[in-house]
Curated annotation (Swiss-Prot):
InterPro entries: GHMP_kinase_C_dom, GHMP_kinase_C_sf, GHMP_kinase_N_dom, GHMP_knse_ATP-bd_CS, Homoserine_kinase, Ribosomal_Su5_D2-typ_SF, Ribsml_uS5_D2-typ_fold_subgr
Keywords, ordered alphabetically: Amino-acid biosynthesis, ATP-binding, Cytoplasm, Kinase, Nucleotide-binding, Threonine biosynthesis, Transferase
Binding site for ATP: 91-101
Full protein name: Homoserine kinase
Pathway noted in the entry: Amino-acid biosynthesis; L-threonine biosynthesis; L-threonine from L-aspartate: step 4/5
Any one Gene Ontology BP term: threonine biosynthetic process
Reaction catalysis annotation: L-homoserine + ATP = O-phospho-L-homoserine + ADP + H(+)
Subcellular location: Cytoplasm
Length: 309
């Protein structure tokens, strides 16, 4: 039996649309992510557990974990009969890499169970393919940090899919999920087909400056450059209360604030625990819309997916 935990992730980070992502873990020890268990069996079966299991497809073939098992078996050239259990702790359509959690946990669990026949690069490529089935396009900004941990920059050249960017230990990520769903496909459809030249220049300046600031250990500069001219101006209309929340968190003292992935989760970056707590309290009182919503104060999850049983 193998049990694998895969952490939540925040893609884009305002400054890196489709090319940056960070794995996150709550500072209070709460597990914000999915678990997948694989056990030997005579034939395949899949069981769903967890807080958000009721939101999953009822037909096993439509479940991404089943599709991961099927693709993994094709990849290694043999059918491996197993019982898989998905513990779905991540809300679907939240902007926290929910589908990536399931994909990464399922594939890592299968790879561990079978004695690691696939290397890291092939695993990551397969994860991107599986993620693409849900979002409509292959992208790695959730699966890469979820799998490898830390802050990841998508490279996709010279056989390299992603590489780690140094983060800052003092950064606290306040993540507020309001409890509503925004589909990745819908959030992508709202974006323009073409961008103005000045926006392209600003985006390049912000992203290059951010990576430079990370490597030269300038946290305040890095946070200041976390601006989004590509997606946020258009996606804000999908997120009730986002503009007000952003203004409030910055006034409280957040270093940066933006949309996590395609939303509706908001992230606010703080460099002091008391600031993070005040931001979390405000978001809990004003940004959450129902009982399914939550706020977590997080740090970077540097471990990524790991075997927990």
């Amino acid at each position: 039996m193998v049990k694998v935990y895969a952490p939540a992730s925040s893609a884009n980070m305002s400054v890196g649309f489709d090319v940056l992502g960070a794995a996150v873990t709550p500072v209070d020890g709460t597990l914000l992510g999915d678990n997948v268990t694989v056990e030997a069996a005579e034939q395949f079966s899949l069981h769903n557990l967890g807080r958000f299991a009721s939101k999953l497809p009822t037909a096993p073939q439509e479940n991404i974990v089943y599709q991961c098992w099927e693709s993994f078996c094709q990849e290694i050239g043999k059918t491996v009969p197993v019982t898989m259990t998905l513990e779905k702790n991540m809300p679907i359509g939240s902007g926290l890499g929910s589908s990536a959690c399931s994909v990464v946990a399922a594939l890592v669990a299968m790879n561990e169970f079978c004695g690691k026949p696939l290397n890291e690069t092939r695993m990551l490529a397969l994860m991107g393919e599986m993620e693409g089935r849900i979002s409509g396009s292959i992208h790695y900004d959730n699966v890469a940090p979820c799998y490898l941990g830390g802050m990841q920059l998508m490279i996709e050249e010279n056989g390299i899919i992603s590489q780690q960017v140094p983060g800052f230990d003092e950064w606290l990520w306040v993540l507020a999920y309001p409890g509503i769903k925004v589909s990745t496909a819908e959030a992508r459809a709202i974006l323009p087909a073409q961008y103005r030249r000045q926006d392209c220049i600003a985006h390049g300046r912000h992203l290059a400056g951010f990576i430079h600031a990370c490597y030269t250990r300038q946290p305040q500069l890095a946070a200041k450059l976390m601006k989004d001219v590509i997606a946020e101006p258009y996606r804000t209309k999908l997120l009730p209360g986002f503009s007000e929340a952003r203004q409030a968190t910055m006034e409280i003292g957040a270093q940066a604030c933006g949309i996590s992935g395609s939303g509706p989760t908001l992230f606010a970056l703080c460099d002091k625990p008391d600031t993070a707590q005040r931001v979390a309290d405000w978001l809990g009182a004003h940004y959450l819309q129902n009982q399914e919503g939550f706020v977590h104060i997080c740090r970077l999850d540097t471990a990524g997916a790991r075997v927990v049983g």
